[in-house]
């Protein structure tokens, strides 16, 4: 491609809306342009990268025995109602009606569609196993779109589904997909790790996320310092810290005027936050739920939602709801006598002695409270783990890092096949539900994650296999006929070799062209300058290294060498 013919617009200034490096660079390098909040148009350069990632995904999925097809993005409500998710998915689903007043949605995910296709097409165990996938645009009405394509309302995703006759078949399909995902992310140049995860709204049992470590990641990921254990913090079990046993004392009401925060309470009572139990009140659809945690702990909303069961939306209760539940101002809630539908008590609180709680009375707290004697609830693990707690597998210490999810694999089991009546006839002539697996990759999020891991102060540094162009050929002075002619000859020869080459034939200064080539992340640069009269050009790698002066024939071999180094063929 010649840049004089390209729709490309690089930006020198960082757009005010962009918060993270990938968002900044995707806009500055001309990969995409914003149309509305969380909605982007992909420019030619960005689309080439997306297509390269798609091709990697296709190759690895096909190699693992999966078949590609394309489902409709517009889905009738009936399918979602069959699975019970039409109401369960919540406000993130884009819903619409056709001219006949029939309900539809723009697909945020496609379990129901795939299940419907397979129940109509597959009748016998002889037609199994089956693994289908598609690469398609998905739609989710995010409450707060941010970070560019990391959390957008429209995004490209590969979603695949396996159908087996038994658990053994599912386990095999799941492992094939896990290996395929490892290959995909390695080829994309990503340092990604599979971690244990919660199944969320998708449902099912076994689940793993492929996480990319990132300082701006939206997820906290728990890693063991000694073994291979890794899990999303939503999933990681906490290790309760047992308090020293004490003789139970009588409950005492204490006036605490305007003392609401844990920090202020600890100062007021001259105690550690570990001696305080805080009561958080949530609205879980139509239920009011109170959760009691040790004062220094953070609530884990996924664990809480799982304990409640079938929750569409979980959020902190309004001030009005808190007052109705406690009869007091916000900041004085406690588990004794609270009026809620469900009371959850973290296992750590159940093992504390003589602790402090809100009295459900404005400006009042209770001390010397003990679980079992003074109140009871559903005891469980409802908090986030913290650095230094014990690994659930080896007992050594854990650490926590930020991460971005780029892929997710699930063992769905029969969740959808049973609810939608999707069955096959087994060897004994009996109807049985398909055993399903689900496998997703965020294609556009993967592109952004590659940029997050591969950039410097000058711009993007694309890994060779995903780069929009492999080589940028730059005539230093397009007005110099010899430079312009030789640059085009080199460009044409590279294309004959199978190299994606970009000829910067714009009437711009060489410095502008160099900056744009670096900003766009082109892995190799060949400059045709004053030394062309001696048959020599300059070669430079985007990811570092010195400028090399080579003959024209040598530069072709140098390009080949980079492909060989990356195990790529021409």
From Swiss-Prot:
Q: What class of enzyme is it?
A: ligase
- What Pfam families does this protein's entry cite? HGTP_anticodon, tRNA-synt_2b, tRNA_edit
Give the InterPro entries listed for this entry.
aa-tRNA-synt_IIb, aa-tRNA-synth_II, aa-tRNA-synth_II/BPL/LPL, Anticodon-bd, Anticodon-bd_dom_sf, Pro-tRNA-ligase_IIa, Pro-tRNA-synth_IIa_bac-type, Pro-tRNA-Synthase_IIa_type1
> Carries keyword Cytoplasm?
yes
Tell me, in one coarse class, where this protein mainly resides: cytoplasm
Show the domain comment: Consists of three domains: the N-terminal catalytic domain, the editing domain and the C-terminal anticodon-binding domain.
Q: Could you tell me what this protein is called?
A: Proline--tRNA ligase
